[in-house]
Amino acid sequence: MGAGQSTDTKGHGTSPEEMSRILAQRFASKCFTPLELAHLKDNFNSLALKQDDVRYWNEEVLSKFLGIPDGDKTLGHGPFDAGPVIFRMVSYLGAFPFQNTLAPSVLTFDAMVKVIVLLTDRYGKVLRRGRKDRIKLLFGSLADVGRKEEPSLEAGDLEQSPVEIKPHEAGFSVDKPSNDTDDYHDDDDLVLAALESLDAIEVFKHDQRIDRTVYEARISFDTFQRLLMLLVIIAPLRAFEKTTDYFSQLDEESLKSARCSVDSILTSFDAGDRTNGIDYETFSWVISTSLPYMFDPLTALFEHLLFSKNLDLSRRKDSGTCSVNEEKQKHAELSPTPSDPAIILPGSFKPCILDSAIISHLSFFLPTASPIPNILQNGIRLHGVFSSNTHGESLTSFSHNVLTWDAPSVILVTGALNHPSAGEADTITVGAYLPHTWRSPTFGSASHYDTSDQSQLPCLFQLSPRHVMMQGSPSINSLKANLPVVSFSTKSGIAIGCKIPPPTRTSMDSSRPTPAGSGSMWIDPALENAEFVMSNGLSHEEGVFLPPGLATWSPSRSSCEAESETIKISIYTIEVWGIVRTTSTPTQSPFNHSRASTANGDIPDAIARQQANWSFEAREAERRREIHLNVGGGDSEEQTGRALLEMAGIIGDSARHR
């Protein structure tokens, strides 16, 4: 089939429209199963509008099918109008790879095929450089500052004028010529891999000669805010769930939390003047280094197109397989409501920090497993390990609950900014992802980290009022012993990424840990105050974390001098959430999770092991109490009691060497 298509397209007289159609056919055969294509065709044709011989979708049809708000003024400070933003994106991506010549495209079936591939995780099959190329396409689809004004593709407009794609239409001014020669501005090879087999390189290059000012255009903050609000709300969405459920059950509290997360993320793209919008360099830098999974919710959203309610292919005779529709219904029956985040295991304490918006925010950047890093897609569950509101504000309680947890965890700290100019509403939320267990200085040897797996590296972050993310250093295994990832002491408090001073005869371990490297966090022994430190990494001091992946310290803005910021926090609440890796996968229902199931089925999971540790500690405490009660009745009894204590290692030489 491929050879035949290639033969048909030889010569450079083939039009971009014809090449775009052939490329859509290639995408369809390479990226979809026959069953998925059948469902997609049924969904498209059942709702398509028609003008002459052209069948197409407009913004109203697309928004209604996807279940996204289109002009809804109840979900934000202004109109929560995600519909036009999504439609602008698909109109641009539907013209791929001839955005300059054909964009904005009419949303035909061929355009829809390309849109689904590029907006879901199927893009890796057609883009040579994967995620990097996709970021360029996403930026171009969102850029609306400096873009030539185009008539909106509303149903009324399409009915009044012929649906026609002119062969050499000017397209978006976002794709006009530019003399930019920077390496990261050159995307001539963006889709050469997809076109090489079609023998159409010259056609593509002709279109791409003037496809450079995509990097001079900008994304308005208003447009990006509407998209972010959508992504935060539907982050847990799966292809078998109704998108409308995530909006219908929103209350004022959840909306407020979602707006807070959106504002924090927007601030990380803010270079000082929001009226200028977001340029390509900032967009690419922040997405690549700080929010790599932010667009993942689009996969589930657009995979709705691959499930048709009208088809039930299992009705065939002798068919022993379930249809896609039956599978969707089966999952829907097992799915919890969006107001009850399924990621939190039953039996956990009531969270004060962690809510749906925070979970969505974490899913945008926190790698918790491999090969699927997104915490909302890889079957990860969260178990409440410690809450200062529930378990008390003491290191004794913290030690009892946290040091007995022997699996990865996330610590969240929220409080007030402790500086003279701070107002009552100036709150901050910071945290860290710790892929290994918490260890006190007396526990064994240092942990070894698999630096080839991002989910095995620690991560330090700030969630609000500005999104900041500091990934663990690849050289973490070569750090000195006084630079542990996490340290716990009843006298010096909790330290993450800090340098631990050596104990002295007078102070023992009461010396305060000091900041090191590009990021650290310290919590005092009373759990009342914390310090969050981040720097641009130019101090030449080794540390656990890399510099923040923010536009503030991007390559174009880097300073020649070391810069650091110390944020002092008056703590309101501390929460520690355990990471429970389950055996469920995105294709299975994760909602039937049993606490007895883990990634390694031959050992109990972390919750059971922690409960076993607590039971052991209780038995040991009771045994010691009985020994002490029995000692002192006579010489023989005293000797027997002493012998038992020595055997237990509580007294004697063995105790001194522990």
From Swiss-Prot:
Q: Does the keyword Nucleus apply?
A: no
Q: Which UniProt keywords apply?
A: Cytoplasm
**Single GO cellular component term:** cytoplasm
In terms of InterPro entries, this protein maps to:
TLDc_dom
Q: Where does this polypeptide localize?
A: Cytoplasm
Name of one Pfam family that matches: TLD
SMART domains per the UniProt record, alphabetical: TLDc (SM00584)
Chief subcellular location: cytoplasm
Residues of the TLDc domain = 352-580
Location of the region described as Disordered in the Swiss-Prot/TrEMBL record: 318-337, 499-518
Q: Biased composition, Basic and acidic residues: where in the chain? A: 318-333
Keyword Cytoplasm, does the record have it?
Answer: yes
What protein family does this chain belong to?
Belongs to the RTC5 family.
> Function, please?
May be involved in a process influencing telomere capping.
Q: What is this protein called?
A: Restriction of telomere capping protein 5
Q: Which organism is it from?
A: Arthroderma gypseum (strain ATCC MYA-4604 / CBS 118893)
Q: What is the lineage of its organism?
A: Eukaryota, Fungi, Dikarya, Ascomycota, Pezizomycotina
Q: Gene name, please?
A: RTC5
